[in-house]
UniProtKB/Swiss-Prot annotation:
Keywords for the protein's UniProt record, in alphabetical order: Membrane, Nucleus, Transmembrane, Transmembrane helix
Entry-linked PANTHER family: INTEGRATOR COMPLEX SUBUNIT 2
A GO cellular-component term linked to this record: integrator complex
A Pfam family assignment: INTS2
InterPro entries per record: Int2_metazoa, INTS2
Function (record text): Component of the integrator complex, a multiprotein complex that terminates RNA polymerase II (Pol II) transcription in the promoter-proximal region of genes. The integrator complex provides a quality checkpoint during transcription elongation by driving premature transcription termination of transcripts that are unfavorably configured for transcriptional elongation: the complex terminates transcription by (1) catalyzing dephosphorylation of the C-terminal domain (CTD) of Pol II subunit Polr2A/Rbp1 and Spt5, and (2) degrading the exiting nascent RNA transcript via endonuclease activity.
Secretion signal span: none
Gene Ontology biological-process entries: positive regulation of gene expression; positive regulation of neuron differentiation; RNA polymerase II transcription initiation surveillance; snRNA 3'-end processing; snRNA processing
Oligomeric form and interacting partners: Belongs to the multiprotein complex Integrator, at least composed of IntS1, IntS2, IntS3, IntS4, omd/IntS5, IntS6, defl/IntS7, IntS8, IntS9, IntS10, IntS11, IntS12, asun/IntS13, IntS14 and IntS15. The core complex associates with protein phosphatase 2A subunits mts/PP2A and Pp2A-29B, to form the Integrator-PP2A (INTAC) complex.
Lineage of the organism: Eukaryota, Metazoa, Ecdysozoa, Arthropoda, Hexapoda
Protein name, per record: Integrator complex subunit 2
Domain of life: Eukaryota
Cell compartment(s), UniProt: Nucleus membrane; Nucleus
Mode of membrane association: Single-pass membrane protein
Amino acid sequence: MPVRMYDVSPRVFCAMQNLDITLLASYPEAEIRPVLPSLVRMSLLSPLDNTESSMESRKEILAVLIGIEVVNSIVSYLQVNYHELENELKKELQARQKSAFFEGQQHEYGLQSGIALGFERADVARKVRVVLSEIFNLQQQVSEQKPAAHSEMLDDGIYLEEVVDILCIALAELPSLLNILELTDALVHVPNGHRIICALVANFPDCYRDVVSHVIANCDEDGSDGKHRLMLLMGLSEMNPSQALANRSMCVDMLKVPSFMLKLTLKHPEDLIAFLTGLLLGNDQNLRSWFAAYIRSSQKRKGDALNLVRVELLQKVIQTTTNAAELRDFNLQGAVLLRLYCALRGIGGLKFNDDEINALSQLVTSCPQATPSGVRFVTLALCMLIACPSLVSTIPLENKAVEWLQWLIREDAFFCKRPGTSTSLGEMLLLLAIHFHSNQISAISEMVCSTLAMKIPIRPNSTNRIKQLFTQDLFTEQVVALHAVRVPVTPNLNGTILCYLPVHCIQQLLKSRTFLKHKVPIKSWIFKQICSSVRPVHPVMPALVEVFVNTLIIPNPTGKVNIDHMHRPFTEAEILHVFRTSKLTFFAEELPPMAESQELNQIEVTCPLTAQLLMIYYLMLYEDTRLMNLSALGGRKQKEYSNNFLGGLPLKYLLQKAHHYHNDYLSLFHPLLRLIISNYPHLSMVDDWLEEHNLAQGNSTVVVSKHELKPETLDRALAAIQTKPHLAIRVFKQLLQMPPETQAQYGQQLVKHLPMVFAKSVPRYVKDLYNDIWLRLNAVLPTTLWIMSLRAITNGSDTMDRRTFANESLLEPMEVLSCPRFVFCSPYLLMILLRILKGSLAASKTYLNVHMQMQQKQVLDKNGMMQTDAIWEDLRTTLIASQESAAVHILLEVLDYIASKATDRVSHLELREIQGIIGTYVHQAFISEPSLAKLVHFQTYPKSVIPMMVASVPSMHICIDFVHEFLNVTEMEKQIFTIDLTSHLVLNYSIPKSLGVSKFCLNVIQTTLSMLTASTKCRFLRNVMPAMVRFVETFPILADDCVNILMTTGRILHSQSSLGMTTMEMPLTDSDKLCTYRDAQLHIIMIEDAFKALVTAVMKKSDLY
């Protein structure tokens, strides 16, 4: 009578894996019974090699099998003709596929007395056939997704041993029909299927990993067969416990069977916390989402695996809390548990039960030692109180939390900053209190998530209890303000410090106007923090400066606090304290000395560049905010920084440094650049940026000279520059190798000799070197350099006070052009002058915008007329346009003057160079403001300059679009100028549109000639005749129109010469007749000459025909 099959033990499976026959021989017969099929088959098969070791192994297997009665029946299964059986089974499978009723006719498989009794009485071959047919029937039901029918052989445990024996041998003998993975999919649906599969895997241990991965990949816990597959996986894991972690890894990789994964983890409880932490806080977002979804769904159906995990975690929390005094790494273990429970709650949505809440409350309110790890534990515990509101859901729990927080405040070791650390718990408590007072739950959520290093949702309504604790019981608003200002500034504050700092607290308090409300001064603290900042700049520092400036100027939106009683801007002495180490501050002139207080002298500037950039950002933002809120000030006097003071600070140099260290000043460079472009456009001109880039490319390496350049040496070289230029060349090259900070020290000496350097007798190479030095100085502190350059050019330092682009002197661009005539005749001086002129016009435009805004607001305050906007806008536009057009006209008149004085070859070369310089300036002016071109040409300029303008200004082609409008003007001079301009334009731009404009000009000429008197007609024709020739030269098709104009004009002049100037003036005397005849001859000669010129122009274009 068959007996029930024993499950495969782990040691038997291990011995089968290693084929350790000695161990198998030492195990009881019942224990090795499931693996006998493989052992019997190995003993009967002929070995592949006949080595001595192979023979010994075979003897050992036979020794194990001797005396086991069931071996004989297994041997009989091996004697079946499997080749013939395979053919029969194939036919059966084909018949199953063809007939839908096959399974109904094969229930008994040819057995007369039923399957169970017939199976016992059948011969060996029939038994094998019955078992395999039963398997095929089961596979067919599974493939058709039908519920598995009852099977006497597979459901009853008394036949399992024989079924396993047959299947093990059939798997080896019939590989084309049977596959262990397919068998697994079929057998998993029967009650004893997991035991059969485990026995099969034990006989084929090399298939273990394939079977496990196959079952995991196809397992759905919510499916109908999920429970059976879980039983199979647990059976396989118990059979081979050494692979438990490997199986768990497969679950994680495939994102399958989380219950099995957790049960495997519980077999290694020491690894539980680390494993769960990795799932929820790892870098794999898909894994985190998958496990979080499992936690939520498992809570609904009360999954046993999750409950077991919660029980184990709860025991660990209780054990850790109970043994806190004895554990050396309590802080570390507690911090890990806190983060894990926060992740389970925030990411997985786990709802704590009462036991977990009490245990976690006990853990959170622990009082560790004041060590760095203790501070870390307490910080995480504080964040967990906020992230898990259930920890303060009852009055006892709330009281316990309040006592713990009060203990934190009393403990200076926790509340105050510890040596060697960048933050303190007190700063974090302050910042939380600030956020709670201002009801900024999103900022609290961001802070908690950042501290816990996880993204968890914190809803506003869930924080009401903890908010009440902070704002009413612990930190009132006044306590927060008074304590925050006494917190020391963060030394060496930089962007790599990611924790929450005092600067965060101050920034939030300033933003909420708490300091103003409770009359707490804060300027000194902010100044110290600016001086203690280093690069890379902390991202909150620009925000701190911005909110400080807003507090100084912008009124409180609620209107409850008068802002004029407390905060004060930085004084000039404080600002100069930051710039005291700079070699570039006021290198042209010194301001009156300012006394520094003893407290100010004790403040050390850690990183001068960072502090100076922050202070410049403050100044730019302060001025911009003040000007934008003039109406909001309501007549209240607000501090203004003098223009001379602002002009002496190296704004442009610092902006370049911020651009050079762009990554270190990422949060500061862009807003600073925006402010400078808006308020100081002369410091951010395109030409300067391109010039500085080219200089940086050409001199990428700065060589520090071993020998310092003495001022006496520089003066001596500059004084003898005309007689001994080699001295100047050597000195200038040495200067070019110096960094800009060092060059600036010699700026006053260099600029003082500016006219002497650019004298005609000085070699051009020396001028080029000096020009490079001037451009380098211009890149450092341009406003001061421009002032000194203008003084040197005008040779009247007494008549020109110190001027910057924020006051009236240099705001008038015409004063820049009021220079001696030799300046315009020197190409180098002219380039310097035009660079200053561009900056002057840019600054003047900004000043007029601000001035218009101020005046406009004042007018609106008086009468509120809507027309005021347009009136002031028109005035501003008109004034700016008049300044720009006046500058262009002056330059064009200079060009006309120089052209009139050009007599020799050298002067013509200088004229050509100056023409290119002025043409480039005019071109840029026309491109930036196209309407300026229309205004300049409407006002006209010397006709002799027109050819040079067309040749040297590429943007002159835009005049073709509007030049026809000027021909409608009745003034003859403007018509002549327009026709002459048009002729040069069409000669240079022979495009279809030019042909239409040319025809229009000829029509105007013809119409005008028909309406003029004889003398006026001749004068007009004499002026437009060269233009007509250029029209014909460009478009020969216009020759007929020009000839027609000449012939008509000639007939009219001839007729009038015979009658007099008019029909009423008959020539009565001989002298009058002679005079009239002489004039007529001259007119006829002029027309003949014009006709010859036309013919010549047409002949030049003969190649077109």
